A protein has these predicted regions:
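NAD(P)+-binding Rossmann beta1-loop-alpha1 motif at the extreme N-terminus of oxidoreductases
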Residues: 1-40
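Rossmann-like NAD(P)(H) cofactor-binding subdomain of soluble oxidoreductases
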Residues: 20-21, 25, 37-92
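Conserved beta-strand segments of alpha/beta enzyme cores
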Residues: 30-32, 63, 75, 117
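Predominantly flavin-linked oxidoreductase catalytic cores and closely associated redox partners
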Residues: 82-87, 91, 102-104, 179-187
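Internal alpha-helical scaffold of NAD(P)-dependent oxidoreductase catalytic cores
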Residues: 90-175, 215
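Interdomain hinge/lid region at the active-site interface
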Residues: 168-217
Length: 217
């Protein structure tokens, strides 16, 4: 009989949230995955809620890296994958990985093996970086979900996939064309349509509509 020698993990991911599960699935035997109450040896990746990072980091000083894009903890390096995790291994080729502090070279390579593209992010720019990420991800989702809720409230039930195909097509166009991929009345300077659309919206959506529409003027 042929015996298989178990592979010793190169590092341990602490936290079984969506990020921890996704990275563990992608790295396979290279990474262990434990609940955040565990105290493993070796290099530890803190994949825990932001509010828990500072306290846990004290238990692994000098041998941990956290994933929180919003936090800078002096002496605790950060590797923040600029993506939205769902707990599954995905194709992350070309996804930025923001590095702040002395992330070990081996861990940089491990992220690179998954397709992430590392870049150095100064600590003082993390709040701006994180705000840009929230605008792109959380706020974009809020706009889409809010727009569908506005329609449902007036009895408009869109068939099929609702507004999602429009959102996907818009992202494809902007990815391919940059600012030239933008369309709509604000791009055309159609003030009559802008006024009618704004009048149809309740607050705060009316103000959001007008502010965002003119934000790139």
């Amino acid at each position: 009989l042929r015996h298989t020698i178990p592979m010793t993990p190169e590092f341990t991911i602490l936290g079984r949230g969506r990020a921890g599960r996704a990275l563990a699935a992608a790295w396979g035997p290279r990474a262990g995955l434990l609940d955040h109450g565990a105290r493993p040896d070796g290099l530890v990746i803190l994949a825990v809620p932001d509010r828990a990072v500072a306290e846990l980091a004290q238990a692994f000083l000098g041998r941990c890296v956290h994933l929180a894009g919003s936090l800078h903890l002096p002496g605790v390096p950060c590797a923040h994958p600029l993506t939205s995790f769902d707990g599954q291994a995905r194709d992350w080729k070309g996804t930025p990985l923001a590095i702040t502090g002395a992330v070990p070279d081996g861990l940089r390579r491990a992220f690179g093996d998954l397709g992430f593209a590392a870049f150095d992010l100064p600590a003082e720019l993390k709040p701006l970086y994180h705000a840009a990420a929230v605008l792109t991800s959380g706020h974009a989702a809020s706009l889409w979900l809010g727009a569908e809720a506005l329609l449902r409230a007036r009895g408009v039930a869109l068939p099929g996939r609702g507004l999602l195909p429009l959102a996907e097509a818009t992202l494809r166009n902007v990815a391919a064309l940059g600012s030239a991929g933008r369309t709509g009345p604000f791009v055309r300077g159609d003030e009559a349509t802008i006024a009618r659309d704004a009048e149809a919206l309740p607050e705060p959506w009316r103000d959001i509509f007008l502010t965002l529409g003119r934000s790139l003027d």
